[in-house]
């Protein structure tokens, strides 16, 4: 794609097609600046009467630990601001980072996803260090939803949303790599030069838990949607084949 706007519109079309083909779809959603444009485009399509969220169930990738939902930096707040408050979705789920028994919450979250029939389509952004969800570089891939310690680079990247770095939560509850890979279809979005290296490692690198997104190579239905800057470290022929794959039919 040429730019962020084009990337967002393309991603929104893929999600809209999913909802039209299967109105009771189970969506896997992400937060952060990358999918914001996609959500805005979906709200627009909803307002035009093209899509309906009445029978949709959604599960978010992650939520900060010990940050109340009403805090304007919580992912619950983000989702309401950018999507949930603007469409007719009733059955949405986020991990609860305020519970005392985190392990039980993680297990319950996995069970809720399974009970809903699994995720039909999952949107992902990617961190500069290759993280997806809050699955940070590690010596092993963590399979299921879990409590994660955020790395200094992630805390620094997220500090732009907080008054100071000290205020950024140091932990989060996140779907595991195994949870993400169980999704039937995955849409990976990346925009900007800052993501180019992570994308190149994801596409060309060995599968390595130090670059969590490389696990996506194990999935048989991943659509990668990039703007030109994020694709700048890919070989032209690979970028063109990715563009071809991600063209909405």
Language model features with spans:
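N-terminal active-site beta-alpha-beta segment that forms phosphate/nucleotide-binding
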Residues: 1-108, 112-115
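Residue-level detector of conserved catalytic or cofactor/ligand-binding positions
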Residues: 241-249
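Accessory alpha-helical/coil subdomains and C-terminal extensions
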Residues: 146, 204-242
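Class I SAM-dependent methyltransferase SAM-binding "motif I" and its flanking Rossmann-like core
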Residues: 129, 133-177
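Internal active-site segments that recognize and position negatively charged phosphoryl groups
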Residues: 107-140
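Short internal beta-strands
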Residues: 57-61, 190, 223-228
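Glycine-rich anion-binding loop/nest that anchors nucleotide
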Residues: 123-125, 168-201
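Glycine-rich beta-strand-to-loop/alpha-helix junction loops that act as flexible
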Residues: 29-34, 124-128, 191
């Amino acid at each position: 794609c040429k730019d962020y706007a084009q990337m967002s519109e393309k991603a929104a079309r893929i999600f809209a097609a999913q909802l039209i083909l299967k109105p009771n779809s189970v969506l896997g959603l992400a937060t952060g600046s990358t999918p914001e444009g996609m959500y805005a485009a979906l709200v627009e399509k909803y307002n035009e009467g093209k899509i309906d969220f009445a029978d949709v169930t959604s599960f978010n990738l992650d939520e900060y630990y010990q940050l109340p939902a009403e805090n304007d930096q919580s992912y619950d707040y983000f989702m309401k601001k950018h999507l949930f408050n603007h469409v007719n979705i009733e059955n949405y789920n986020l991990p609860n980072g305020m519970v005392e028994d985190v392990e039980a919450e993680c297990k319950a979250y996995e069970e809720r996803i399974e009970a809903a029939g699994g995720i039909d389509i999952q949107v992902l952004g990617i961190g500069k260090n290759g993280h997806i969800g809050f699955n940070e570089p590690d010596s092993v891939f963590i399979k299921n939803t879990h409590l994660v310690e955020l790395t200094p680079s992630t805390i620094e990247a997220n500090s732009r949303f907080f008054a100071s770095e000290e205020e950024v939560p140091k932990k989060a509850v996140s779907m595991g790599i195994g949870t993400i890979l169980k999704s039937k279809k995955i849409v990976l979005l990346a925009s900007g030069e800052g993501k180019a290296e992570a994308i190149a490692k994801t596409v060309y690198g060995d599968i390595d838990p130090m670059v969590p997104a490389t696990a996506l190579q194990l999935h048989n239905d991943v659509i990668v949607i990039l703007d030109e800057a994020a694709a700048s470290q890919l070989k032209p022929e690979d970028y063109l084949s990715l563009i071809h794959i991600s063209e909405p039919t």
